[in-house]
């Protein structure tokens, strides 16, 4: 019985503290150990009990294990909601528990600061090469404004930001989205994204590690899928586009921000670009083939490179066909 396992899981002061911390943000097990002042193996045992009870969930990101409050459909109501209210009341009424939670939050603030410092140091190391590339592009603020306008007036709903990188696009769209999932293959980039997003409500966003050619989500999981400056890293862009189509619900949308076709060969060498931009005709063909109805693209000239914004609506009754096609291709392989 789950009620029994939940009550057992909460019958420990450390696990109560962990649950209060997770109400504020997702934390690595090592970060929890740092906040709680306990060894990592000991904290891991507490984490296992909370996860077994269904109160918390683990998520692997490279060699790190992150913990968050359970985000199942039932977590906003019933037993999970009752637990949240109980912990809030306990902190209000129990002075000793309240003092301990306040101390934990002070340590949590140090974790936030450390994440932001790590992000700043990373950008400082790569600033010169990124500045050279940015100098060729249309200003970021102009591109972001064009993306926001291209997505209006339809609600964003559940958003998947594929190749989230630093998390800037997830941050930009979070206010208008019901929930944001930022996906990236790089643990380093996910740490940068976490530093950027950590001040948003913890139930508003999550991060996931994965590849854009094999998205770790079920069909029709999202209302909006964004690929911002991602597809030029794909040797065969139709593969990530097929995956984006699979996870986008009928009636949803895909938004692609990328470079127009160009001939700057140095981007292959310095920045690992597999494709030197794209033509409108390429995207018209790819998006149509994957069940989208493209709108007219937006063109944003820069100082040597042109940025394009392509938005397309997902046509109905294509998800099942795409799933069958994907399964058939796996069998053939």
Can you say where each PLM-predicted feature lies in the sequence?
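C-terminal alpha-helical "lid/dimerization" subdomain adjacent to the S-adenosyl-L-methionine
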Residues: 253-311
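N-terminal helix-turn-helix DNA-binding core of bacterial DNA-binding proteins
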Residues: 2-42, 48, 63-74, 146-148
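Amphipathic alpha-helical dimerization/coiled-coil segments
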Residues: 2, 74-129
């Amino acid at each position: 019985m789950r009620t029994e396992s939940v009550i057992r899981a909460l019958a420990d002061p450390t696990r109560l503290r962990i649950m209060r911390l997770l109400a504020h943000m997702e934390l690595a097990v090592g970060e929890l150990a740092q906040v709680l002042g306990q060894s990592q193996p000991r904290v891991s045992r507490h984490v296992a009990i909370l996860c077994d009870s269904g109160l918390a969930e683990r998520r692997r990101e490279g060699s790190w294990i992150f913990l968050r409050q359970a985000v199942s459909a039932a977590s906003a109501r019933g037993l999970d909601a009752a637990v949240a209210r109980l912990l809030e009341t306990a902190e209000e009424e129990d002075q000793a528990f309240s003092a301990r939670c306040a101390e934990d939050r002070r340590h949590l603030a140090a974790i936030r600061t450390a994440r932001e410092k790590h992000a700043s140091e990373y950008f400082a190391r790569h600033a010169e090469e990124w500045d050279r590339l940015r100098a060729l592009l249309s200003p970021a603020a102009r591109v972001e404004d064009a993306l926001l306008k291209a997505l209006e007036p339809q609600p964003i709903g559940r958003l998947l930001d594929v190749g989230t990188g630093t998390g800037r696009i997830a941050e930009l769209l979070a206010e208008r989205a019901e929930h944001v999932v930022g996906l990236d293959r790089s643990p380093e980039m996910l740490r940068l994204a976490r530093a950027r997003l950590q001040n948003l409500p913890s139930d508003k966003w999550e991060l996931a590690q994965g590849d854009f050619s094999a998205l770790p989500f079920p069909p029709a999981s999202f209302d909006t899928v964004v690929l911002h400056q991602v597809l030029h890293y794909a040797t065969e862009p139709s593969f990530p586009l097929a995956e984006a189509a699979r996870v986008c619900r009928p009636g949803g949308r895909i938004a692609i921000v990328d470079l127009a076709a160009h001939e700057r060969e140095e981007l292959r060498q310095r920045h690992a670009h597999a494709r030197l931009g794209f033509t409108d005709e390429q995207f018209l063909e790819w998006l149509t083939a994957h069940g989208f109805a493209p709108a007219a693209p937006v063109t944003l000239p820069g100082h040597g490179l042109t940025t394009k914004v392509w938005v397309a609506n997902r046509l109905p009754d294509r998800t099942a066909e795409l799933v069958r096609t994907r399964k058939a291709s796996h069998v053939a392989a």
